[in-house]
């Protein structure tokens, strides 16, 4: 194996070995513009946050445009399917209204799914609920396929994260 001749070449070789991260964001603005504002803040923030840390990533926003109740599960599964087809290795299922702070680790989840937002500023950095599995969770492709993704029969807000938690653990 050829050894790098300098630091820049070494970094280039290391970057080629990186896993590709898909940030999967379910999205729907209920008409009040609040979620649109969240998305307008989320995308540039995440681009900067992940770029500064050297991640190879792409943000996939699955936007539900019909008048039915929001199906966050279906939007997450759709984003996963598209990202998987594009060859991504692991997936961050991310709420649009939650932004990571320094210390949030989006690294490849080797052994099991990883819940990134266990302690949030909105809860004074205390764990809200031992079973809370929302905000942002990381899965490898294999881990997500093994639990068969999110269950698509949860409509409106909530429960899909709890259901996934129980199927993972």
Predicted features by range, described:
Residues 1-48, 52-55, 61:
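N-proximal low-complexity "stem/linker" segments adjacent to membrane-targeting elements
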Residues 55-56, 87:
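Short loop/turn motifs at secondary-structure junctions
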Residues 19, 87-89:
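Short coil/turn segments at beta-strand junctions that form active-site/ligand-binding loops
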Residues 67, 71-76, 80-83, 90-94, ...:
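Conserved catalytic core of nucleotide-sugar-dependent glycosyltransferases
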Residues 64:
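C-terminal interaction modules of eukaryotic adaptor/scaffold proteins
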